[in-house]
Amino acid sequence: QGLREGERSLQCSEMQSRAHEIITGTVTAVDAERGNIVLDLGKGGSAVLPKNEQVPGEHFTEGQMVQVYVVDVLATERGPRVTISRTHPGLVKRMFELEVPEIYDGTVEIKAIAREAGARTKMAVWSKNPDVDPVGACIGAHGSRVEKIVEELGGEKIDIIRWSEDINEFISAALSPAKVVKVELLPGETKSCRVTVPDHQLSLAIGNKGQNVRLCAHLTGYNIDTVSYTHLRAHETPEHL
């Protein structure tokens, strides 16, 4: 029994050292009814990848190798309880840390990340070295770095944005691909702003089912009301324009 406890303790320590890392597991069972899958993580460890932690549209078969993000590891009497995910923003963040040398060595920093798994991720980056373009470093020559990650994520779109401590600049960049005319921070305790965009870019700014503006809000921490330039002119007095 003491030997088994020692093994469990060692197993827990090993898995805890892999928290917030990407690991590859092998599918050993698929629950067709619930959609959950069981992964063998090696060294006697296993974990369940629940349906709600899988990217929409993904399908798995026994024997398949799957990359997952280790969200948490809890030591229990029966061994480590490992929480894994493929939808967590940390998966994308860690992929960039491993793929981009400038992030790995600390020159470029990921300041914020927002993700709707399987559809789109927005990531804000900043460089400690003014000679290093943080966005270019993440994209890579001819898009090589970002394309590799997009491929691993099954075609998920990734917007890489230059982070700024100027919140107006940051919000404007985060709303890309739409071009912003004006950012107005609104008074009050909640972080809110009104963003004006050209009329023909309003639907682009809001995005499919509100996705673009929703990710922008998660990334910046601001509630965002997006309006068209015509709407602004119709509702504001001349001194506000």
Place the predicted regions along the sequence by residue.
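Extended, polar beta-sheet/loop recognition surfaces of beta-rich domains
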Residues: P238
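RNA-contacting regions in translation and RNA-metabolism proteins
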Residues: Q1-R233, L241
